[in-house]
Design a protein with these regions (language model features):
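Nucleotide/phosphate-binding catalytic cleft detector across ATP-hydrolyzing
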Residues: 1-173, 191-192, 202, 215-217, ...
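Glycine-rich phosphate-binding loops at beta-strand->alpha-helix junctions
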Residues: 49, 228-231, 284-308
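A short acidic Gly-Thr/Ser loop motif
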Residues: 49-50, 174-181, 187-190, 199-203, ...
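Glycine-rich phosphate-binding/hydrolytic loop that grips phosphoryl groups
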Residues: 314-339, 343-348
């Protein structure tokens, strides 16, 4: 079972803004779900974490083993523990991605048992502002009085559901077009190479459409029903829109609507392209780019991106073998999928 509750203004750019209002909406969601489940009580929840300040940083841990050293499981564990103890200034570590190992400066995917004098582990840390996690814990655990089973980094969970192991190995960028933010996750060699967030999402497009003198709910409907990432300015087709008072209809040109959408989407995409180019991996993305999320369903978006980046861009909700329907279900499914072997964030 799944349920949806409109976040309104309590979530801004993927982050909890109003703790009390968020708690109220979560309690309503839990009640709706329990009713759908025939009165079964929900005791714990997994929470997906994303938002504006989320990003990856590099952190390297080294250990000198001496001339007769051999890498052991204990050494690998000690490197990981040292990495976990690292506290970057003004940031909270939300997840630690599996590292790349270098033995005497040479890459090694399976280091245990290999002799070397020095081992280096290069980690990708997923970090964010402390409030990113604290506000979630406060709204759910403290205000709503619901136990949190674990907090998972949403883009990583989504990557495990949408991308195949082969795509991650060949090199692939996963771009999640959300309501408040757009997330760029780049994989290479089977591992996460970069994670960054652009603080623009589909909500901005909806707000721009309201400048055509329509209310926000009607603007969202127009975007979903008629919207295109590329405007056909020679198209004379008109569409009917509801008046602000809901008591009548008027007409606007489809080209005018999509001109508004195209302008804002171009701004979002230029920011996405800049983040992709900054990774230095554009030339080695053998599996191309996969787009997902509600905003990714915008008509002609894959073609617009493919033309600009000169590589394959495809829309995908889930990879083969995973059954789901709709972006909201996929987002939820990604948390369930990754919480099985799980690496949930400590909430202490």
């Amino acid at each position: 079972a799944y349920e949806v509750e409109n976040s309104g203004t309590c979530i801004r750019r993927g982050c909890v803004y109003n703790v009390k209002e968020t708690a109220s909406k979560i309690k309503r969601l839990i009640l709706k779900l329990e009713n759908k489940l025939g009165g079964t009580k929900i005791g714990q929840v997994y929470v997906g974490l994303g938002g504006q300040s989320l990003r990856s940083i590099e952190h390297t841990v080294c250990k000198v083993l001496g001339t007769e050293g051999v890498v052991t499981e204990e050494i690998i564990d000690s490197l990981y523990q040292e990495c976990k103890d690292y506290r970057p200034d003004m940031l909270t570590v939300l997840d630690v991605v599996s590292p790349s190992y270098f033995l005497d400066d040479k890459p090694e995917s399976n280091p245990v048992g290999v002799p070397c004098s020095r081992i280096e582990a290069r980690y990708k840390l997923i970090v964010g502002r402390p409030s990113l996690k604290l506000n979630i814990v406060n709204s759910i655990s403290e205000q709503a009085k619901i136990e949190i089973a674990g907090i998972l980094v949403s883009p990583l969970a989504l990557g495990d559901v949408v991308l195949s192991d082969n795509e991650k190995d060949l090199g692939c960028a996963l771009i999640g077009f959300g309501a408040g933010v757009t997330t760029i996750s780049v994989y290479k060699g089977g591992k996460l190479a970069s994670l960054s967030v652009v603080p623009f999402g589909g909500n901005l497009i909806t707000k721009d459409i309201t400048n055509l003198r329509v209310v926000e709910s009607e603007a969202e409907r127009l975007k979903i029903t008629y919207g295109s990432a590329k405007a056909d300015r020679d198209n004379d087709m008109t569409i009917q829109v509801s008046l602000a008072d809901g008591m009548g209809l008027r007409e606007i040109k489809l080209a005018e609507l999509n001109g508004v959408i195209e302008a804002r989407m171009d701004e979002i995409l230029e920011n996405v392209y800049a983040r992709l180019e900054a990774t230095g991996l554009m030339s080695v993305l053998g599996a191309g780019i996969v787009i997902t999320g509600g905003g990714a369903a915008l008509k002609n978006l894959p073609a617009v991106m493919s033309e600009r980046l000169k590589m394959e861009v495809r829309y995908s909700a889930v990879r083969k073998g995973v059954v789901a329907s709709g972006d909201l279900v996929v987002a939820s499914l990604s948390l369930i999928h990754i919480s099985e072997p799980t690496r949930p964030i400590s909430i202490s």
